[in-house]
């Protein structure tokens, strides 16, 4: 950027169409967050009515993560072939329909299936909205685009918590899910009133349709084998998370089977760049493992361990959700200032100072607990707002939505494991200690994976001929693309 350009406030670099595109996607993500967290808010009520164990109840949260990998792949491919806008609209309709079905669910299995539908829609919304906004904004503002967008999910969670405190005590938990049908009206407005992403339009102007992940996996020479593997993965995940298996060895074998299938899909879809894709799945897996025990089970902790009433729970969750939303925006500024990976690491290190005090303070002082949660979630959860930017930078526009959606949502199975692991540990320890220990230890794993740029590093080790040296979104160099001790100037000079 020129000196003159740098002196212009960042928001003046955006025109009216770009702001409208962002606003529409942000509202869609807010509604996504609203619908998705409803189950966490009413988990104890659902558990009591259906007579579920703690692990079975936690699996209702996990269910939405089980189907996310497939939703991310299919709806991401739709976004790559037909445009980001159509994929966004389809995603909103899916998660809204699933939420309505939860309100009518007569029992555990029906609600589990409805949560699978929500997971597919959520995955599509994440991939399509993220690529839509990132590709619509100027390159030097794309960390802000990512962070600002993802803040919508946390705002949706805050709104859901407030609605919970007003609706559930009067009309019961089912009424909360009936409200979740409203986003379909918004989806119809979206279909007519927002433009397509600029990067996608430029890439596809006057050209034949691209070959998407769906084409490669389900219309190519290995389509029969891939369909069989898809069914096998879905079945294995069902048995792992539906609360039917108690044998840890069998669960481990099924988990390894799923991992092998997902790696096979990544190898087929990305060719020589498969090491990057696989490592990104690992990064996202641990990102969910450190963050989602708190996200999923915090309402249960507040209601059971601290014995808070619904109104107090809503107030504490407001601090938590608002902190995450603010953190997404702060993360966007940090990412554009320090660089995506450096901002991520610094924010997570700071969050580690707060995680133990959050669960050690107890429930005597609600306001102190709320403030601690605000800052911990701002630093620890909010920085995940720039994760779509981080992942998307490793891939070109042609496959970005599908690969981002698939990579992110396979890794998001950590979110399915997290509440169950937290619930299992809580059978031996109190829930607060379980949540704190999980989050504290696994955050360090994410710090190492991102700080060392392991996706680029493993790519360089295994398939160096396909190594990408610079971010495809903002053009900045990847630190892991060069060995330790190599001159960074060499990387800047050899930009390809």
Swiss-Prot record:
It comes from the Bacteria. It catalyses: N-acetylneuraminate(in) + H(+)(in) = N-acetylneuraminate(out) + H(+)(out). GO terms for molecular function: carboxylic acid transmembrane transporter activity; sialic acid:proton symporter activity. It is found in: Cell inner membrane. GO terms for cellular component: plasma membrane. Its main location: membrane. The chain crosses the membrane at residues 22-42, 58-78, 92-112, 116-136, 148-168, 170-190, 224-244, 247-267, 278-298, 313-333, 353-375, 406-426, 431-451. The keyword Transport applies. Keywords: Cell inner membrane, Cell membrane, Membrane, Sugar transport, Transmembrane, Transmembrane helix, Transport. It is a multi-pass membrane protein. The keyword Transmembrane helix applies. Pfam families: MFS_1. Belongs to the major facilitator superfamily. Sialate:H(+) symporter (SHS) (TC 2.A.1.12) family. Catalyzes the proton-dependent transport of sialic acid. HAMAP family: MFS_NanT (MF_01238). This is Sialic acid transporter NanT.
